[in-house]
Amino acid sequence: MQLNKHHIPLFIKLSFWLFISIACVPLHAQTEIEESVADRDTLVADTLWNDNDSLFLKNDTLAWPQNVQKAIDELLQNDMFKTSQVGMLIYDLDADSVIYRHNERQLMRPASTMKVITAITALDKLGGGHRFKTDLCYTGRIDSCTLVGDVYCVGGFDPRFNVDDMHAFVEALRRMGVDTIRGNVYADKSMKDEDPYGEGWCWDDNNPVLSPLLFARKDKFIERFVSELQKAGIYITGTTGEQRKPDSANCIISRFHTIDQILMRMLKESDNLYAEAVYYQIAAATGNRPATAEHAHRVVQQLINKLGLNASRYSFADGSGLSLYNYVSAELEVRLLRYAYSNQLILNHLLPALPIAGVDGTLKARMRSPFTRSNVRAKTGTVMGVSSLCGYLTASNGHQICFSIINQGIMHAKNGRRFQDRVCSILCRP
């Protein structure tokens, strides 16, 4: 189709104004569109917070911390708080005093900031040298090239067990000269109970399976092990199944991953499976077998009581924060963060694993200003109706701060995140 001479001026005009309208969109608005597409909880445009909001700035006529307190007071006047709640506690670790408190004792669902509670409890109970172990054992004897007996893969709930570890298991048998297993191959999953999911998990979520013997995050360890044995030319005469390893069994090889390796992914990427693995390590450390989530709850409660709070006020159901039954407070999270800060054996393992604002993990796309970037180190949390953030930062006066912010009853988590980011910016900005 050809344009006649009457259509050309209109076409040119429309093209010109379309170009101008696109070119004149503010940079922050274009960025906002990209962020809303990437935002998992909603594609609804965020209208409650304006990036140019004057409330974002501190009152320079007031001294620290009054200027911070005034600015946060003004943030709390936002319309979102007419229909939602926030619990918040900000603590100056150098001055050993509270900077700001608001509903800090109100019970709320922590979402994935529960992982910080799990991490601190684990480091306190297990220590920074703890390792997640998976064993390969056998019973019977090795006669020539034949293992006459049974082989046991003993799970210690290591979520990082991978292809290299599996190959190491197979290679260990090859180095013993074994080309035939005249017996069965068993999965020993006795380390924990048989519950495949956490208490209070939503049935329609994509939840991880809580097995103590995993391969590549799946409960298919024995199937893959047998397949790798066959590829290596090792023949099995028996069957596969689940059975606890006898005390008399011989250990062929053990594969380990450190607690630092687990915490790094658990906190930076908010990995729920890793958090539950840590929680069951806490439970197993009590000496109970099989370990249960209830055993871990008790350890968490013991730590809370030791820190001077009443553990019976809170509810714990899992280690990841997926459960609908977890209820904590900003006061509790800050008390645990203070405890970790005062204990270098905990802090040296916790701090490097927390997401860093504007740099990595779940904070990579948040708080990119010069004052917050690489400064705020905190754990994020998001479940339906809840957005949370807790961790550490260095304030504008050089003081070390720990904080917890839990937004509850919000339809769109982005609104909670923006409030949290502004609070952190107020603390960091000169």
Predicted regions and their residues:
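Bacterial Sec-dependent N-terminal signal peptides
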Residues: 1-36, 42, 47
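Beta-lactamase-like hydrolase cores
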Residues: 32-94, 100-107, 171-177, 429
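Second-shell loop/turn segments in exported
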Residues: 54-63, 101-109, 151-160, 170, ...
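Active-site SXXK
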Residues: 96, 110-128, 185, 224-228, ...
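Active-site-adjacent, His/Asp/Glu-enriched structural segments that form or flank metal-binding
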Residues: 131-193, 200-208, 214-215
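A conserved catalytic-loop motif detector
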Residues: 152, 168, 190-232, 254, ...
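A small/polar active-site loop signature that marks catalytic segments
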Residues: 218-351
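C-terminal soluble interaction/assembly domains
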Residues: 315-430
